[in-house]
Each structure stands twice: as structure tokens, then as C-alpha cells.
Amino acid sequence: MEMETDEGINSLKARIETQHKSHMYMLSSVQSVIPNFVSSLDLSLKVLSSFNHRPFAPTPPLTNFNPPKSSSLQQLPQKPSVKTLKTSLVVTTNPVLEKVTPLSVVLSMVAVCLLSRLPFMEIDSSTLWRKLENDETFTPQDKAAFQELAGDSGGPTLAVEIALRSMADDNGAVELEEFAVSGKSRIMVLNIDRTRLLRQLPETAQHQLQQQQDELSLGDGNMNQNQQQIAKCSMNLEDVDALINKKSFREMQKYETAKELLKIIQTPSIREAAVAAKFKTKGGSQMRPYCDLPTKEDCRRRTGSFIACNKLHFRRIIALHTDINLGDCPFLRTCRHMNTCKYVHYEEDPTPDLPPTMMCAPPPPLKPLKQQRAEYCSEAELGQPQWINCDIRNFRMDILGKFGVIMADPPWDIHMELPYGTMADDEMRTLNVPALQTHGLIFLWVTGRAMELGRECLERWGYKCVEEIIWVKTNQLQRIIRTGRTGHWLNHSKEHCLVGIKGSPEVNRNIDTNVIVSEVRETSRKPDEMYAMMERISPGTRKVELFARMHNTHAGWMSLGNQLSGVRLVDEGLRARFKAAYPDVEVQPASPSRASAMELDSSVAAQTTTSAMM
């Protein structure tokens, strides 16, 4: 019994070996006519193996396969000549089989490598080339195809990138993104479309080859059956991939629910809308944009029209001493020698483009620009401006009370000629700033040299430096300043403001930016946008400015400095404390009547109640 079993096993092995040699001989015969046939077949089998999660064994080299001595081969019809086979291939106009280009080889290999990544994860072109190079089926002929496609200008990675771009351009089979690594451009494959990527495989060529084999009677029935199964599986892969990618009903429900939740989250609530409206400028924005071209003539010349745009323009001031060949004045509006400067200066141009007699209809009246205010709320809400002309170094800060916001623009000693006096570093350190604040913010303007000194002063006064605001300076024509009056080595086109915090103040966070782009004006005058920013950050609190001038006085602010006009106090308690400390100093205005003060308080209360009801 055991003898019969061994004989059956040996007989089966012999039949398998004979069948294997028969198949290899037929493959070798076809390979001699169509060089790319075996590699295309291996690629298709590798794709099927990856989808079925089965190991893949490549076809061994077809070098010395002799025809097996089997009755099955003897029954085969006579093999036609090579000339007849080539003639039949030419008749069948198949570009894939007529000419195998290096691009088609690289496209097939890259497509197989991308399809074998289950699930798909992002991969870059260099990593993709390494995976192809380390594959056991990678032959020297394949490497030669990569080198031929890349040419002398690049390596195999360039060939991979050429194939990826070809896939993306032809049918959008891959989603690509370029990035740079060490100065070299690389491609990242973000996602793939398996249905479209399968079209890069030579399935059509295999199908036509099978038809030609049937006509030429090459191969036995088993091989034709295998080819038919491969083609059928390849055609069904698209349907399977589409079915896998299709979302289920539960996934669709989750997607719709998430979409509705996102819409609800992004919609501002009534409270958020009210808070946003609170910080809008009362009466609407008063801003009028400037045109990119300075004059109306330049604007008309660019547009080819007789009428310039509605934006603000300038007109050149040409005096008797002006030399147009010198160009624009570096300082423009801030020039200190306007009467003798030979450069060109500018002023705003309010004149209409055409006289009224030439216009069919009267032009719309220009909206009058109100005086620009830094505050976003009314004077009644803020209160009246107050100031004290004093020497801040020895002034009694304790009589002023506590403030929520402090802004200071000290006259730092920057070792340059300035039109005002400066303070020594030790005098800055010993200022009695801590008496003005327990909980709040301080905004300290510093120069380049005083940057670290300002941080030291903040720490000495009890503050923690948390932010830094940058003011980018522009000139009258809204261009970046290139010839500033400050700077030892380079012209300074910006200034810095250190922001310190003390205690636990109640402030509005993340409602403003740390960069301000604004036009320069008088010496040491800071942009008015600072006052609006501080009012938004800490609304309704008392605010004081140190080292102020008359142009710095604002509603709701207390200003201290030695260049102010006398003393103006409207707060009764503050007037009393100041009179007690400095009885010989005259205070303006005359002591306001209690009725006027009560009217001011009642108006503020009424506006507060109205806004609360809204």
C-alpha cells in the first residue's frame, strides 16, 4: 500500500515538473519575440498577489529552457516563423506592444509599487526609488530604463518624478506636492486613485497578446485560461476599488452630522456678535484708501481714462526754488526746511478731474473726513482729557491714584542731537512708576540702544514683559521710510514698544496684532492707532501717558509731561488732591459746577444702560 502511495506521489511530481517546463518553454518562445511580455505578466501577477494578500514568486530567468520531451508539446501545431509573428504584430496596431519605451516601463513599476501600499501612506520620490531598487524583481534592464528616462541631467529619482508627473497630468491618478530638501526639489505622493492608477498597467497589452497567441496557436489551453483569469480579475479590480471607497450609510450619517455641528460652531452667537459690535468704530470707518500712484496724472496714464480713481491722490508742490531733477524729498511732509528745500514735495489733491461744465451730471459730494480719533467710542463714554505740566522725575505720583493702562515714551539718551532734553539711565530706573498701578498693563516705547534697558526698567518696576509691538513707519506717500533720522549704522524704519503686565488685570486678549503700519508725523509723535488698541484691550479703565505733549492729549487719558500747557483737571477728587499737594499751581478750567458734572455722569450712565438693553 505504501509503495503505491509513493509511486503516485512521484508520478504527480513528474507531471508537475513536465508541465512547468512546458510553460517555461512557451514563455521563453514568446519572450524572444516580445521582450516585455514576461515583465508585464509579473507586474500583473504582483498586483493580484498584493490585493489577495498572497506571496509573489517572480518568473525565473528564461535563459536555457529546452523543449521538454512530452506528448503535450508534440501535439502542438507547428510554430510559425519569427518573420510571420512580427508581421502579425505590425498588423495589430497596438502602441504598447509595438514599442516599449522607458517611460512605459517606469510607469508600470511605479504604479505597482504605489498599488502595493495597503493602506496607502504618503511617500516621497526618493523613498519610492529606494523601494523599487531593493525589490527582488528589479533587474538591470529595469535600471537601464530608469537611467535612460532620466538622462544625463539627473539620477533614477528624476525618472520616478517624471513618471509621477506623467500620471498626474494624464488622468490625475496621483495627488502630488513639491517640497525642498537640502536645496533639492522633491515630490511627495499625497494620495492615489487606484482605479485610474490601474490603467497605467499593461493590462490592455496582455489582453491583445492573448488574442494574438490564440490566432498563432501559441501555448496550450491551460496558459490561455490563466491569461483570461488574470484579465478578468484586473477588470474587476476597478469595481472592487470603487466599492471599497464608497461610503456606507453610517459613514454618510456621521459626515452629515459633523458638517452640521461645524456649521453651528462657526456661526457666531448673539453674545459674540454683540461683543464684536462693541469694538466697531462709532459712526463707521473714516478711512479713505490711498491710490498706488501718487498723482492723478499717473493714475489716468495707467488706466488710459480721463478720470482718475476715487482713492486719495497727491499733487506736486513746485516752488520757484524746486529742482524737479532731484526727485522727491526724502522727508516729504516732515521736512524741516520746506521753504528752501529744492526737492519735490506733495500735498493732498482735492480738485475734481473735470470741470463741472464738461461733466454731464454734477459729481457726488465728497464725504467730509472727520478729525481722526483714536478711540472707538464717544467722548461721553471716555470722559474729558486731563493733563499736568510737571517734571516726572520728582512729581508726586501717589496723588493721581491707580490706572489700568500706562503708556510712556521716555526721552532715552541715544547719544545724538535731539530737539528735546534726555534722561539718564539711572533716572529712568528710579522713576516712581510702581505708584501708578497695582493691576494693569504698561506700554513702554524704546529705541535700539535702550531695548535691554527698557526690559530692565520693567522688571525693576514690578512688571513681566509679555509682548513687543512694532511700528513700521511710512512716509506721506504711504511708502516704507528709507531715510530716517535715527540709527547709527542703518536708517531705522521701525520702532519698538515693550508690553508689560502687573498683577491680574481684566483685559481682552487676542483682538489686535503686534504690528502697526502708520505714517510718521512730528518728532517723537507715536501713531494714534495705539490709543484705540489700548482702549480695546482694557476698555473703561483709567489711563495715563508719561512724557506726553499737547498732541497726545486724548479723551479719557491723563497726560503728564514738561511740554504741556499748564494743568487741566476735571475730576473733583483729583483736583482736590492736586490742590492740597501743589497749592500755588493754577488749575484749569475753573472749578466745574456740580450740575455740569452730574449731567456728564448721567449721560454716560444713560448710554451704558442703552447699550446693555441692546
UniProtKB/Swiss-Prot annotation:
Residues 604-614 have a biased composition (Polar residues). GO terms for cellular component: nucleus. One of its GO terms (molecular function) is mRNA m(6)A methyltransferase activity. Gene3D superfamilies: Vaccinia Virus protein VP39. Residues 59-78, 589-614 are annotated as: Disordered. InterPro entries: MT-A70-like (IPR007757), SAM-dependent_MTases_sf (IPR029063). Keywords: Methyltransferase, Nucleus, RNA-binding, S-adenosyl-L-methionine, Transferase. It is found in: Nucleus. One of its GO terms (biological process) is methylation. It catalyses: an adenosine in mRNA + S-adenosyl-L-methionine = an N(6)-methyladenosine in mRNA + S-adenosyl-L-homocysteine + H(+). It holds the Pfam family MT-A70. S-adenosyl-L-methionine binds at D391, I392, D409, K526, R549, M550, H551, N552, N562, Q563. SUPFAM superfamilies: S-adenosyl-L-methionine-dependent methyltransferases. It is an enzyme of class 2 (transferase). Its EC number is 2.1.1.348. PROSITE patterns: MT_A70 (PS51143). Residues 479-492 are annotated as: Positively charged region required for RNA-binding. Its main location: nucleus. Residues 67-78 have a biased composition (Low complexity). Belongs to the MT-A70-like family. Putative N6-methyltransferase that methylates adenosine residues of some mRNAs. N6-methyladenosine (m6A), which is present at internal sites of some mRNAs, may play a role in the efficiency of mRNA splicing, transport or translation. This is Putative N(6)-adenosine-methyltransferase MT-A70-like. The lineage of its organism: Eukaryota, Viridiplantae, Streptophyta, Embryophyta, Tracheophyta.
